[in-house]
Structure formats: C-alpha cells, structure tokens
Amino acid sequence: MKIKRTQEIDQFFNRCLHNIQNESKNNFLGLVVSKETEKDIQKQMKKAGFFEFQGDSDKWPSLFISSNDYMNRPYHKTIKLEKIISDEFTYQTQMVNANELFSLSSIQFDPKRELNDSMRLVALDEPMEVTILYQHNEVWMLDVPSEAETIDPIAKKAYGNVLTFGLGIGYFPFMAMLNPNVKSITVIEKSKSVIELFNQSLKPQFPNNIPLTIIEGDAFDYWKEDVLAQYDSVFVDIWKSNDDGLDLIEKLLESYLPQYDKVDFWIESSCLEIMPTLILMYFESISRNKHAKTYDKDYQRILRKIDAYFKKNDQMIEDVNSLKDFMYDMKLHRKILSIKL
C-alpha cells in the first residue's frame, strides 16, 4: 500500500499525534466530584477532550451512577458470595467511596477516529460495599461495577448454545441464563479449584432453567474450529485486565481466527487499544518511505504484522477516511493479530 501525502492527510496525522500525546484525561481518575461541582468538572473534561461532553451541554451524561441500581442487579440480589467456603479462597468486603471518578467501561473509541479514545469516567452517588475475592492471599476477583458494565451487554446479545472460556464467580453464565435466546451454556475453566468453589458455593444459588456444563480444560486446547463450530456464540474472559489481554488474544487468534460476529473478547477495545495507534504509526512512516519503529518489542512485533498485511494491498490512498477505516476496523485488528510471522 502507498499513501499520497496531501495537506488533508498531513493535518490528520498531526491531529492524531497530538491526541496520542495528550494525557490530560488521566488527571481526572480519582477526582472528587459533587453535584455542586459536576458541571464545572464536565467543562474541564470537555476541554481535556472527553468526546461525550463535546455536544450540547443539556445532553451531557451525568458523572454519577446509582450504587443502589448496581446492588439490585439480578446477580447481586440472588448470589451471596459470603456463602463461599474454601481453604484456598477467601473474601473480604471493602467500602468504595462515593464521589470519586473511576473508569466504568472498556475504552471508547473516538467517534472522529483520530485517536482521541477515552475512558468513561463516573462516580458512585453513595458509598458501596464491594467484595474482594482472594486466592492464596492474592486478589483473584473484584465484584465491582466495571465488571458488570463490560459483561452485561455480551450476555444480552448471546444466543443459542453458548460457549464461554473462564468461569470466575459465574457472573457471565448467570446473566446469560436470564437471556431467553440462550439454550445452553458450556464453560471451559482451567482451574480445578475454581470449578470446585463454583460447584460447592455458587452453583446451588443459580437458576436451573437451562443446561450449564463446566469442563475442566485449557482454553487453548478447546480454541479450535471444530469445537467452536458446535456453538452459536462464544465469549472469552481468561485475562485479568488489558495488561495481559492483548497477549492472550493474539495467541488465540494465531491459533485460530474465528468468524468475527460469533466471538466476543472481554474488554476487547481496551486490550486492543494500541492497534489504531500502531496502524497510524505505520501509515505515517510509509507515507515518508520509512519503516515504523518502536522500542517496545511486543508492539514492534505487531508492527511487523501490520506491515505483512498491508504489503499485500496495492492501493494508493489519497483520502483520510480510508485511513480511518483501516485504523478503527476491529475485524481487521483481529485479522492482523492472527498473522504468524
């Protein structure tokens, strides 16, 4: 692929590079907000580039979410984590302060597609007690609003025979069971201890309206075309955060690239947040007949995959929208990551 440097494309590159370097959004994490200061903070967030505050101020979303609404979600009303009895797993409760901004969802991609991607920051309207689960005295699972916010939409869109990788405290299977379009749920879980914990303490509290099957096994042993073909929708949740998510998603996709619409990866936009930036770096470099480079060895490997993909494309790109289409195509992100070098 070749890129013709035009004034429009140069200006686009400059805007993207400016957005990459703008870290002012991070300054709002943990900021204390009240009903009295909410509007002023929203104005500051607008100035920092949060795109949800760029339009008419009357339509700006509130910075507050209801603690009561979260605690009254079906899982929390039904499942009592204090019933967990295990020598290996323990739990503690901790109060989360109200009026402090935290990230609720996975990364939201810039509607203008110019790398002004951002977190959705909100605060609880009242203090809330959350559960922290430990395995061998190390934090294993946090029962916090962001977990529900990032899993509920996937449970609602699931249908037919569902396969999920990763059991945890069973939040996804529980919510998927409430979906009338789901016929059965199969879970692949590597840890025998997690399965025993679930079967002993949590499964008895679950509804039994549809079959729930738990298989002890490694995700990579079941991530195969013939296995996934037996299911209608697939959800993968085997990483702790976006820190290890990109690496695991890449390894899975190198093993097998499934149909895009059939599979959801937990917090995929956060795990793959770097992809639009790396593609932009590649485009900017080849427009100058240079090779894109980064000091991060993992990102450099992905740049090599990006190069391998676009080398097969003999297009001459002369417009910004074509570049944006490539940068923000999540189906393309998966395809690039699936390339074996």
Regions found by a protein language model. Give the residues of each.
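Conserved beta-strand segments of alpha/beta enzyme cores
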Residues: 184, 211-213, 262
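Short, conserved loop/helix-junction motifs that constitute active-site signature segments
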Residues: 179-180, 229, 255-259
